[in-house]
A protein has these predicted regions:
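Negatively charged, low-complexity tracts enriched in Asp/Glu with abundant Ser/Thr
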Residues: 1-54, 79-88, 92
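Non-transmembrane, interaction-prone segments in cytosolic or luminal domains
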Residues: 30, 67-70, 95-98
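Short, conserved beta-strand/beta-arch hydrophobic-aromatic motifs that form part
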Residues: 43-49, 56-74
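Residues in flexible loops and secondary-structure boundaries
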Residues: 57, 68, 78-82, 98
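Well-ordered alpha/beta subsegment
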Residues: 89-107
Length: 107
């Protein structure tokens, strides 16, 4: 696991903890896709935050070719198709920003 995905994972975990404290009815889980994406031929790693009750997931993707950029998308649990929500510099994707994305998309 590369340092940038570790940093992203840490930010996502902190944001998810805050989100679940604020919205006790929400049950979200964190996932890491590192080898799974590479096994599919994608030169990338991703962190997911899944909501089973809404059947939705936020996906934060870092491409090997752009290690300081995080693509953020939303999709359905178990699906591969994503709608792009935006791109962020890794160092600007704060815990507060991830909480905001969770509030906008998983409530």
């Amino acid at each position: 696991m590369k340092n940038n995905i570790k940093e992203l994972l840490n930010t996502a975990v902190q944001a998810n903890d805050l989100f679940m404290k604020r919205y006790k009815e929400s049950a979200t889980t964190i996932g890491l896709m590192d080898q799974a994406l590479r096994n599919l031929g994608n030169n990338s790693e991703a962190v997911t935050i899944d909501s089973a009750s809404l059947n939705k997931k936020l996906v934060f993707i870092i491409l090997d070719s752009q290690p300081d950029i995080v693509g953020v998308g939303i999709g359905i649990n178990g699906g591969e198709d994503l709608s792009l929500l935006g791109q962020y510099e890794l160092n600007q994707l704060t815990t507060a920003k991830v909480v905001n994305l969770l509030e906008e998309n998983l409530l």
